[in-house]
Amino acid sequence: MVYIIAGATGVVGSAISKELAKENEVHLIGRDEEKLSSLSKEIDAQYSLIDLTKTIEQREFSKIIPDDKEIKGLVNCIGSILIKPLHGTKTEEFEEVLRVNLFSSYYLLSSFARRMKNGSAIFFSSVAGTKGLSNHE
């Protein structure tokens, strides 16, 4: 059984990866190969360099875990923040926020959910939503 941690090189993702790796097999996903390589060596984990906002990789990333390996859990720590008034936000910036925060979650869950038997998926969100930051996307 394996746990998949997406956004594994961020503060939250790396802490979760380290804790889960103490007693479980983990597979790290991220966009920074240097950080992924370092973390994978530290906790003895496999990793995949994947940018879930890129179309070509979205179709392929579900193949990173062999079909005969059960996925016990999926942890999504991918996220970004754009603090800017709407009237000053370019369409490209808004689309990037959607790719990072929304579409990557969809790609992860749609690719791995059917392979999880009695597994769990955990998605982290921003504390900014509970604090009511002005000019927050």
Outline where the language-model segments fall.
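Conserved glycine-rich cofactor-binding loop
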Residues: 9
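Residue(s) in the substrate-gating loop at a strand-loop-helix junction
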Residues: 126
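Conserved NAD(P)H cofactor-binding loop of Rossmann-fold oxidoreductase domains
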Residues: 77-83
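Active-site loop-to-helix junction immediately N-terminal to the catalytic Tyr of the SDR YXXXK motif
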Residues: 89, 132-137
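Conserved glycine-rich Rossmann-like NAD(P)H-binding loop of the short-chain dehydrogenase/reductase
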Residues: 24-37
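Rossmann-fold cofactor-recognition segment
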Residues: 42-56
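Substrate-binding pocket helix/loop in short-chain dehydrogenase/reductase
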Residues: 85-86, 93-98
